A protein has these predicted regions:
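Short acidic/histidine-rich active-site segments
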Residues: 259-267
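Structured core elements
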Residues: 40-42, 216, 261
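Thr-Gly-centered strand-to-loop micro-motif
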Residues: 236-238, 262
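N-terminal glycine-rich phosphate/pyrophosphate-binding loops that anchor nucleotide-derived ligands
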Residues: 85
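N-terminal amphipathic alpha-helix/helix-capping segment at the start of soluble metabolic enzymes
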Residues: 1-44, 49, 92-100
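Alpha/beta enzyme core
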Residues: 47, 53-77, 81, 89, ...
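Short conserved micro-motifs at the rims of enzyme active sites and ligand-binding pockets
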Residues: 51-54, 271-273
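C-terminal helical cap(s) of enzyme catalytic domains, especially alpha/beta-barrels
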Residues: 267-285
Length: 285
């Protein structure tokens, strides 16, 4: 378990230690692991107030426990990256866990889960400048397109600007697109084949160049049709339960799919340990 005292000592008495750790971090020589793919652990959910894993609405609420689970995942062979907000990535920096890892900074966390302004997803975490300054390998943004919510256009514009700014610094711009609707007052992502095709084509066209754009997409039906919508490289996200592994395996056979970005289903597996869940996911690569 990470030592909370050590983290607090650095944060209260030596805050410059964070920048020093980022500068000293050994960067990966490639985005890809020895398996030729990307295997990224996603841990940016808490900043949106999304703490649920499985049936526990506050599963991710204990930060030291979450860090311990992330460390366990990052230590497994074949895991070569992590996605997080500044607070989590800086804890991992102080713990010395980010050497040789592909580090992706999460950017727009302003669309807090369950709020009236959820679709107007402001860039409240990393920006392109801070990602480049820290020496990280990319930035990730969530793009939810709700035809009935005027906040969508602000998010579209912000994501387009972020793609351009990341590309100008030659780092990955990871876009996670959805068509979304409010159902009984809550935002729900449309996971039909047609909706994902439309979302991907919109995301692929963001920014002044797509040279550094990657897409982060969920498993839906007819993934071959979905992935045929663009030539951009893609990473598969999410999924829960036993069926997820079979779905990931099938998706990884598609030519544009370059790996996995998985969070809660590996960090809080329904059965077994974090190591067991991660090793099984890595075996698919």
């Amino acid at each position: 378990m990470p030592d909370l005292g050590d983290l607090l000592e650095a944060r209260t008495r030596r805050p410059d230690a964070i920048a020093a750790a980022a500068a000293a971090r050994k960067r990966p020589t490639s985005l890809f692991g020895e398996h030729g793919k990307l295997m990224i652990i996603a841990a940016d959910h808490p900043a949106r107030g999304a703490l649920r894993a499985g049936a526990d609405p506050l599963a991710m609420a204990n930060r030291v426990e979450l860090l311990d689970r992330i460390r366990s995942a990052l230590a497994r062979p074949g895991v070569n990256g992590v996605l997080g907000t500044p607070d989590i990535l800086e804890d991992l920096l102080l713990l010395g866990e980010l050497d040789d890892k592909v580090v992706i900074g999460s950017m727009n966390r302003g669309g807090l889960a369950g709020t009236t302004f959820e679709i107007d997803d402001r860039f409240t975490a990393f920006d392109a400048h801070s990602i480049a300054l820290a020496g990280y390998e990319g930035g990730k943004m969530l793009l939810r397109i709700d035809p009935d919510d005027p906040g969508t256009v602000a998010t579209l514009e912000s994501c387009g600007n972020a793609v351009s700014q990341l590309a100008s610094r030659r780092v990955m711009a990871m876009v996670e697109p959805f068509i979304s609707h409010r159902v009984d007052g809550r935002v729900r992502n449309d996971l039909t084949t047609e909706a994902m095709i439309r979302a991907m084509t919109v995301a692929a066209g963001l920014g002044t160049t797509s040279a550094y754009t990657w897409l982060k997409v969920p498993i839906v039906s007819e993934m071959d049709r979905v992935m045929a919508a663009t030539t951009l490289p893609a990473l598969i996200l999410g999924g829960e339960g036993e069926a997820a592994y079979a779905e990931w395996r099938k998706a990884l056979e598609l030519p544009t799919v370059q790996g996995l970005v998985i969070g809660r289903s590996l960090l809080y597996p329904a059965q077994g340990t974090v190591a067991d869940a991660v090793d099984r996911a890595v075996s698919l690569l």
